[in-house]
């Protein structure tokens, strides 16, 4: 009896993992769909769906992109532009001030750390700027891309490591080497944020400090803009962690929470990014450049007020690792 040829897998199946039925943070099956982000291009496989756990409020991409899916979107010009949209929304001077403010968070607790690892450092712009405050600190960079090697050649870091912090060989090389570890919008992209936190604490010396900055899932723009909110449209953003969950996890691992901040990390880009995403598939997107510029001006004009409200789109945590294992 003739058999029909096997059905070839859909492109979306190749680029997306099976949908999960429980929360990756607490394990609850009580989920709801929080947002459906529109495809950025007509040829894009599937859409980004963000689910939220009703129990712990952890939000996550579901189904999650596979390694092939991440690679596909990484090669896409528009998706790549979204990944660093927030950084590009700032002038060079404003971006430098922002990096200095983040580095200054550490000053009250450790005026002269010997060694500092910036995880997900990219081109190492943060270490380059932080050296102005910590001229005697040795800054190293870790990134999954060769960008960090270019940063080494341009002397923005003293050591460049390519890979993921959870890679056993990376962890073995860096264990207990650092006084400070920083992660700026890195945990959102980690497949397993808990494993990433464990690895970060492993490379810290006892009493070392962990500086983390993340998109804030409680931001009111998330509800107002829906699928056009920038974090929902970024292919590599896999998780949105509530501050309370992250603080609780750090405390469970014996850390002391020193400071939390929802004001300073706010980046004025929500309206302009939403308009950019909304017009991504429109033939009028180039003609809309003046409209996007106006939205960007409005983002910046409202920023001093919005950063004091639920419209703030990011938060920052500084934690201290226990002197002795918990």
Regions found by a protein language model. Name each.
Residues 2-184, 194-197, 262-263, 308-317, ...:
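Conserved N-terminal segment of class I S-adenosyl-L-methionine
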Residues 21, 259, 277-318, 326:
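Rossmann-like AdoMet/SAM-dependent catalytic core
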Residues 77-85, 225-234, 273-281:
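Short glycine/proline- and charge-enriched loop/turn segments
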Residues 191-195, 222:
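Short N-terminal helix/helix-N-cap motif within the alpha/beta-hydrolase-1
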Residues 194-209:
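A short glycine-rich, Lys/Arg-flanked "PGG" loop and its adjoining helix->strand segment in the class I
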Residues 212-239, 244-249:
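Short, glycine-/aromatic-enriched active-site segment of Class I SAM-dependent methyltransferases
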